[in-house]
Amino acid sequence: ERVERMVLLDIAPTLAMYRGTNEAFARSYWHWFFLIRPQPLPEMLIQSDPAQYLKSVMGARSAGMAPFFPEALAEYERCLSLPGTATGICGDYRASASIDLEHDQADIDAGIKLTCPIKVMWGAEGAIEACFDALSEWQKVATDVKGKTLPCGHYIAEEIPEILLDEALPFLLDAG
């Protein structure tokens, strides 16, 4: 299977984000560094109070908890309470800080870039805007990238869903 087009929201390439870590990024994305700690500490702390963990991560962004419907929050909490969920989340973040970085660097060293059209959008009030040149970073690892800043924080889909659809749908539906 092949990815034909990709929309990325409020993210820079992971290798660039780790290499460019500064105080502002570390404070905003503290959970990245918490989740990569060895088992079982992060899992135990998350599982002890999933609702508080969600509020600590999601509520710490510029919009707080306001963008999230109560039903959506309840579903996040339900899923985070399921056995194995915290382990899976931590495993994903641990991989992003280890083997994924090795693979990303190997691709860069080999001159391998993403070739599908990419549209990256990030929030004007978020850490990506404050800490990275997202468009430039994606252009280093992909051949066809467009991007823009949107009037929101990190949770683009929840904060400005109509604007996101107006931006993403024409791009995704463009047959070339």
PLM segments and residue spans:
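Flexible "cap/lid" subdomain of the alpha/beta-hydrolase fold that forms the substrate-access gate
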Residues: 2-149, 157, 169-176
